[in-house]
From Swiss-Prot:
Keywords: Coiled coil, Cytoplasm, Initiation factor, Protein biosynthesis, RNA-binding. Residues 875-887, 895-906 have a biased composition (Polar residues). GO terms for biological process: formation of cytoplasmic translation initiation complex; translation reinitiation. This is Eukaryotic translation initiation factor 3 subunit A. InterPro entries: EIF3A, eIF3a_PCI_TPR-like, PCI_dom. It comes from the Eukaryota. GO terms for molecular function: mRNA binding; translation initiation factor activity. GO terms for cellular component: eukaryotic 43S preinitiation complex; eukaryotic 48S preinitiation complex; eukaryotic translation initiation factor 3 complex, eIF3e; eukaryotic translation initiation factor 3 complex, eIF3m; multi-eIF complex. Residues 570-606, 793-1052 are annotated as: Disordered. RNA-binding component of the eukaryotic translation initiation factor 3 (eIF-3) complex, which is involved in protein synthesis of a specialized repertoire of mRNAs and, together with other initiation factors, stimulates binding of mRNA and methionyl-tRNAi to the 40S ribosome. The eIF-3 complex specifically targets and initiates translation of a subset of mRNAs involved in cell proliferation. Residues 570-600, 793-874, 942-952, 960-970, 979-1013, 1037-1052 have a biased composition (Basic and acidic residues). It is found in: Cytoplasm. Belongs to the eIF-3 subunit A family.
Amino acid sequence: MSMNKFFQPKNALKRAEDLEAVGKPNLALETLHDLLNSSKHKKQWTAVHEEIMIKFLDLCMQLKRAPEAKDGLYQFKIVTGTSAVNSLEKVVRYYLKTAEDKVAEAWQQSQLRDATNVNDEIDDLEEAQTPEQVLLAAVSADGETERANRVQLMPWLRYLWEAYRAVLELLRHHSKMEHAYHATARQAMRFCHQYERRNEFRRLCNMLSLHLNQWRTPYQSKSGQAGIDINNPQTIQYSLDTRFELISYAGKLEQWQEAFRAMEEVTGLLDSAPEKPSPPVWGIYYHKLAQIFWRSKDYAFHAAAWHQMFDNAIRNAKSFNRDDIQYAASAVLLASLTVPLANLDTMVKPMEGYLPEVRASRQQRLAGLLGLSRMPSRDELLQYMFDLNVMTYVHPALKDLYNLVEDEFDPLQLSQKAAPVLEFLKSHEQFAQYVTPLKYILLLRLLKQLSQLYSSLKLERCFKLASFMTPEECEEVLVHAVQDKVLQLRIDHARGSLHFNNNIFAFNERQVNDGPKLQNLQAEMMNGQLTTLSRRLYTAINMIKPAVVQESQMGVKAINRIKDEVAREHVSNLSRRDEIEKQKEELEQSRRRRHQEQMQKHHQNQMQVRQKMAEAVKKNQEELERQKLQLQREEIERQKALEALNDVSSSSAGQKVVQALNKSDLGTKITAQDIHKMAYEQQKKDARERQERLRAEEKRLDHMERAKRLREIPRRKEHIAAMSEQNAKWHTELQSARLEKARVDHAKALGLKELLKAFAPDKDAYIEEKTAERRKEYMAKLDDFKQRMQEQKIRLEREERERKREEKRRAEEEEQRRIKQEEEDRKQREREAKREQERQEQLKLEEAERKKMEEATKLQRQREEQVRAREQEKLSNLSAQTSQPTWKRSARSDAPTTAAPSSMRVSSWKGDASDDSGRSQPFRPSRGGERDSGRSFSGLGDRGDRAPRDTGRSFSGLGDRGDRAPRDTGRSFSGLGDRAPRDFSGRSEPSRSGPRDFSGRSEAGRTSGERRALHVPSGGADKPSGDNVWRSSRGAGSERRVNIPSRGDDKN
């Protein structure tokens, strides 16, 4: 939407309010944004601009449009300039206050307000959420409430952070808004601390550092406004206060690297200050330095910072009270005493992991912050402490601490004497940090003193003497002290003892201040034994023969003088030779240097000549190029001027300009801008002339109207007088007519009243009668209504009882259905379990039967093998005998036949061999003679004139089996061996299609037809029907079939 139609800013504001009222905040925001960007309304600030800006910021906050808000603030800064700084400050404060209120409201509504790990939700407010984070949030275990809180709170946190950044960038070069800039920086620090935004705090520190570096460079805006002057004392004080606040919040957020950088900036500000900072400023500076050094475990620099602070407090006692001085003195004492004797791992490893060069550079930087040239030692700090007379100002409870640690030799009572001091330190929060390092120092002093009294000591007693530390801490300190060569001892855990090493060959301890000594150790005395002996012998000789000693001394002195003179002359000769060589080298070097200088000078001259020639050529080319460009620019300007002349000639003012111009000056003296300017001036001139003409016409008309009015005044007065007289006459006549009419009406009413008085009793009686009837009807209706209400109440109560009874019945039926369903489910599960159990039992039975069949098959095969062996034996016995036929077929005798002997006749039911003479045949029916079956049972003779039917097997035990392999049916039909009985005891007959059970029938009860029908037919025989087939398992995957015809089917 174009803003050209808004000639006044208040119209745009009203339009935006109307759009917001109808639910179109986006259009309202665009309206105000276009107005702020319009150059037409940036010339002069008005109060309406402030209202527009506040409404604009409200819309940006409603829509969470931080970039638009930032751009609007920049445009408003241009509008305000230097004349309305208070308005800009008011708008900025309103913007930040509203954003902070929104965040606080979202924080209160969010259920994450009790958590301090908001940083775990979104690590960086400036980074967009990645697809991986979106997917992870979708599948995370957070509930809907946590996700809703995150969505509700985090956008406002991001918006507030963007607001802080925008305001700081806006005010960084505004000298009149410097106090607002630093106030905003402190607000941003509180925001980072309140919501645990560590990443944003680091960005804030980088931003403030960048702005400070930019202030060191002179800056001037496009409008001519000067930037912030870093040399201004007020600016320095603002910056120092902001940095000190930054260091405090950095400590709370554990951002000590940022605190150290801020401290370096503070050092630079103090050094560059034109005026000397006040003593309280130095006190704050040294106190912050001491905190940083303690956190970085630079205990020596920490103590040095407290020394500097105490010195500042003493030299400026008027600026500090007595409690501050006492606190500083106590801190100096504790910091100096707790400086480690060595870099024990359990105490401090400040330089671990640093290269020597880096370590030296770091120490130099830290010393520079305190104005020192190097890192002070522990002894120097203690000596400086006495130079400052610190012990006079320390707390009374700490006055004996120095003597306890450095002077007294009482190892057995050291723990008891140190206990009150340690308790005092623990009870005061400002001194509690010194408890642990002080324990380490006390333990080392205790062990040093014990090493002078004992060569070995029980660990239990040692731990008891060091009761201010746990045994584990004591042992850890011992190990690291031996590792760093502070102590000479060893721990024997097997015997639970501590051995102090007094061996003369042991390593030398570090040269540290050992504190009080009772006597030197044996190792120390042995190390200096020869020196002591020499000194004492010299003293004895001097006492016995002083003259000899003096002569000896004089001789020694003369020899020493001669040696010194010889050495001096030798050195002089060597130096003279070296001097000659040095002079030769200097002469040679001077000659070479002069030659090189001449060559360099010649080369430089040539280079200068070439450079001058190149510059001249380049200058000529540039001049030609400049002239060419000038001609091109003039031609372009001339074309633009002609186009502008054509544009403006369409108006009357433009035509006047065209007539007044000299076209030869186009493009040189007169440009297109000049033409437009002249046309604009001519338009303004014409407009002024029109205004003058209009004003003259207005003046003429005013005079004419005034003259007319003056001539009309007398006539208007006469007309008014005549109208007044006529109106009075009309009023009198109307009043008289109204009164006469009222008198007549009153008389008529009185007559009517007298006439109606006779009807008054009848009227009263009629009213009473109607009233009684209406009352009676009302009472009847009331009784009827009460009766109907009572009946309805009874009916409702009855319906309620029925409803409750129906609900109860439905509940009981539902409960019965549920119980019945549960019972049916239980029975169904029992039936299924029973069927499963029966199926398992059936499987077990079938498995057992299969195993029995396999065993029977195996036994049958063994018996068949035995039968074959016996057949072979009988065959060998009968091979020499001559066979005689015993029976033949009666019809045909073409081929000789032989009858089987009685001893080898085969039963048609089973394959048992029987003797006709000695045994009856219970399974064979009694017959008069042998039945011709068409085949021979003799295995020794010919088969007769009729070929036996090929059934795929042989029934003779002596002949060949034919051209087909016998079919294994699980039984033997040979008459020479025993038969393996089949086991049918375990089979049942559930249906006609299953196997039949023969276990209930005896062999004698079977008919001959049944016995003959149990043979196994060949593959070419007719297949038996399904009901008469008996299947049995002979092995894995095998099957045999036996046709069992009915009793009437025996025809063969």
